[in-house]
């Protein structure tokens, strides 16, 4: 399961919503308000993702104990009891919900879908889900993509309906959905040998020797939907530093990935971590540029 760092899209969404709002002639939010809300978004996502990781490791502890890369995880190795894990998970959920309640001005309904999806995710690795052609990457991608909506709502929620917020965020959610499947397929491919022995239901197990082609196919909707999102901001900066850099990065990643070397999936995942942080910087600069113009 991806690390907490993969919750960067909520920051992208909040920062660019703020950049767009600063162009308003009346009642435009201040850059400090936008940055504060963005920090709340990141903190809430970080805490909730931490809780989700504990939940995932709790349900998967028997599987993880039989996989070389994961057998030393706290729950799988027995270093942490299930009771201790539950308390830590509950504390993170409570803290995350408290931050979200303040950030969204009480509109907590925005986070219900991602809570349900996070609870279901680990169960989709079981053979039963495989029979229904449901793979855990679908649910994981949804849980990573959805926070773009609370991210925008943190800035525009008082003036937009839920439907309007979803409409603005849909292209970004689609980008992040396929991006998550892309990087998770590569990341999880490191365990392909052990997971096949355990009959773990996962996308990369189905892809088999065609994993490289699957990764190429997953990049296509990312690069197709990203322009749909960036068009609304009318920013040359975003086109060059986001669209341009992502396109070049994907080309390099796909060239270096080797299906015969499962460890190369880890390198691809790390590269996308850097890409996510880079995009936060890009969106922050866009906010500053728009704020300077509006002064």
UniProtKB/Swiss-Prot annotation:
Cofactor(s) of this protein: Mg(2+)
CDD domains assigned to the protein according to its UniProt record, in alphabetical order: PT_UbiA_COQ2
Practical uses of the protein: Diterpenoid pyrones display various biological activities and subglutinol A shows insecticidal and anti-HIV activities.
Keywords: Membrane, Transferase, Transmembrane, Transmembrane helix
InterPro entries recorded: Prenyltransferase, UbiA_prenyltransferase, UbiA_prenylTrfase_CS, UbiA_sf
Compartment(s) of residence: Membrane
Gene3D superfamilies (alphabetical): UbiA prenyltransferase
Bilayer disposition of the protein: Multi-pass membrane protein
Molecular function, one GO term: transferase activity, transferring alkyl or aryl (other than methyl) groups
TM region positions: 39-59, 84-104, 109-124, 131-151, 168-188, 213-233, 237-257, 271-291
GO terms for biological process, alphabetical: terpenoid biosynthetic process
Main subcellular localisation: membrane
Pfam family, one: UbiA
E.C. number: 2.5.1.-
Enzyme class (EC, first level): transferase
Pathways per UniProt: Secondary metabolite biosynthesis; terpenoid biosynthesis
A Gene Ontology term for the protein's cellular component: plasma membrane
Family the UniProt entry places it in: Belongs to the UbiA prenyltransferase family.
Record function comment: Polyprenyl transferase; part of the gene cluster that mediates the biosynthesis of the diterpenoid pyrones subglutinols A and B. The first step of the pathway is the synthesis of the alpha-pyrone moiety by the polyketide synthase dpmaA via condensation of one acetyl-CoA starter unit with 3 malonyl-CoA units and 2 methylations. The alpha-pyrone is then combined with geranylgeranyl pyrophosphate (GGPP) formed by the GGPP synthase dpmaD through the action of the prenyltransferase dpmaC to yield a linear alpha-pyrone diterpenoid.
Protein name, as recorded: Polyprenyl transferase dpmaC
Phylogenetic classification of the source organism: Eukaryota, Fungi, Dikarya, Ascomycota, Pezizomycotina
